[in-house]
A protein has these predicted regions:
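Extended, intrinsically disordered, low-complexity segments
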Residues: 180-195
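Alpha-helix N-cap and loop-to-helix initiation/capping positions
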Residues: 20, 24-27, 66, 86, ...
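Short secondary-structure boundary segments
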Residues: 17, 64, 84-86, 106-107, ...
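Catalytic cores of alpha/beta
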Residues: 43-58, 86-100, 129-157, 174, ...
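N-terminal active-site wall of soluble small-molecule enzyme domains
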Residues: 9-76, 120
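Glycine-rich phosphate-binding active-site loops on the catalytic face of alpha/beta enzymes
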Residues: 64-73, 101-113, 148-178
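A short, well-ordered alpha-helical element
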Residues: 1-7
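Surface-exposed amphipathic alpha-helices with a cationic face
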Residues: 5, 26-37, 69-76, 92-95, ...
Length: 195
């Protein structure tokens, strides 16, 4: 992982942990925090916001407004991002209540997610009107390129990077090149692709 982070322009790594006791979870986060942060990448922990400070992570990613409220003590010292915002109204409330970023397009607890066109529309709407950064969850390389044309501030690349037969290095290279190219086509200027 550290060589990948050193080579690519990765803004943040979202860590989703399997269920375990708090001590084990804290140890897992601590083991990754140093190498990830040394590469200039923020380490964000999904769902376990209560472990973020103790384990040395940079912040938490939570699902929905209720979890955002429960994790509000992280702000302003730590990053607090929120996803699973199913309506425009929920997204606006998250932005008004201090979310550091909003994630659109990630699967829900049943593995369902909006269509790529619906995600693009939500990203474009948010990017044009609001200040907090928006992140597009890309399940495929094609979605990563599509969402870059929406004006999204960041693109979160999903498991396709890890499942690529060529390895994550080749998949990340392709993703960042596709993101940069699509951004240039859409906005007429190059952008350093950040995933």
């Amino acid at each position: 992982l550290p060589p990948l982070l050193a080579e690519f322009n990765v803004a943040a790594l979202l860590l989703r942990l399997a269920d375990a006791d708090e001590r084990t979870l804290t140890s897992r986060i601590k083991a990754l925090a140093g190498p990830v942060q040394a590469a200039g990448t923020a380490l964000l922990v999904a769902s376990h916001h209560n472990l973020v400070a103790r384990a040395g992570a940079d912040g938490a990613h939570v699902d929905g407004l209720q979890e955002m409220e429960e994790a509000s003590s992280l702000r302003p010292q730590r990053i607090l991002g929120v996803g699973q915002l199913h309506t425009r109204h929920d997204a606006m409330l998250a932005g008004e209540n201090g979310a550091d970023y909003l994630l659109f397009g990630e699967p829900d607890s049943h593995g369902e997610r909006p269509s790529p066109d619906a995600i693009f529309e939500r990203l474009q709407w948010w990017a044009e009107l609001f200040e907090p950064p928006c992140v597009g969850y890309a399940a495929t390389l094609e979605e990563a390129a599509l969402f870059a044309g929406s004006g999204a501030d960041f693109i979160m690349v999903a498991d396709f990077v890890w499942s690529d037969a060529r390895g994550p290095k080749a998949a990340l290279a392709d993703a960042q090149a596709a993101i940069a190219e699509r951004f240039k086509q859409a906005f007429g200027a190059p952008q350093a692709a950040r995933t």
